[in-house]
Amino acid sequence: MTPLIFASEGFGLNLNIFETNIINLAVVVFGLYKFLPGFLGKILEKRRTTILSDLKEAEERLAQAQDSLSQAKDDLSSAKQKADKIRNDCKVRAEAIRLESEKRTVEEMARIKQGAASDLSAEAARVTSQLRKEAAELAIEKALAMLPKKLDSNTQDNFLKQSIKNIGDN
């Protein structure tokens, strides 16, 4: 057994190369140094490439999303402008329709009033004519009723002569 340097009851520094496995450790470190960079380097390079491509793809999707957002904002703005224009056009059209409706209503009222006035005039003329006719008929009836009493033969002769004379003068 090799002596332990600076040993004190169970703990110390062992300088025996074979007992401490320094050679085994050196072989493992040399193997790792020789073979690990190629193997681990390929894995790390592949991982780095994957991460870079994922980042690039994410940036492209971000750019597309920003373009889509910008396009959507433009479309929304355009749609709002069209909606405002349509709303204003509808207001103007509604006002024009309202004014036209009022105008037609006033014209219709004037036509109805004119029709009523002409109907009233026609009815008044008809009633007046009817009253004149009835008055004339009553006057003729009274005259016919009174005529035999007042008309004697002498008056009849004078009346006939006067009528013949009037016919001859015409």
Swiss-Prot record:
The chain crosses the membrane at residues 22-44. InterPro entries: ATP_synth_B-like_membr_sf, ATP_synth_b/b'su_bac/chlpt, ATP_synth_F0_bsu_bac. The keyword Transmembrane helix applies. The keyword Thylakoid applies. It comes from the Bacteria. GO terms for molecular function: proton-transporting ATP synthase activity, rotational mechanism. Keywords: ATP synthesis, CF(0), Hydrogen ion transport, Ion transport, Membrane, Thylakoid, Transmembrane, Transmembrane helix, Transport. One of its GO terms (cellular component) is proton-transporting ATP synthase complex. Its main location: membrane. It is a single-pass membrane protein. Gene3D superfamilies: F1F0 ATP synthase subunit B, membrane domain. It is found in: Cellular thylakoid membrane. F(1)F(0) ATP synthase produces ATP from ADP in the presence of a proton or sodium gradient. F-type ATPases consist of two structural domains, F(1) containing the extramembraneous catalytic core and F(0) containing the membrane proton channel, linked together by a central stalk and a peripheral stalk. During catalysis, ATP synthesis in the catalytic domain of F(1) is coupled via a rotary mechanism of the central stalk subunits to proton translocation. F-type ATPases have 2 components, F(1) - the catalytic core - and F(0) - the membrane proton channel. F(1) has five subunits: alpha(3), beta(3), gamma(1), delta(1), epsilon(1). F(0) has four main subunits: a(1), b(1), b'(1) and c(10-14). The alpha and beta chains form an alternating ring which encloses part of the gamma chain. F(1) is attached to F(0) by a central stalk formed by the gamma and epsilon chains, while a peripheral stalk is formed by the delta, b and b' chains. Belongs to the ATPase B chain family. This is ATP synthase subunit b. It comes from Prochlorococcus marinus (strain NATL2A).
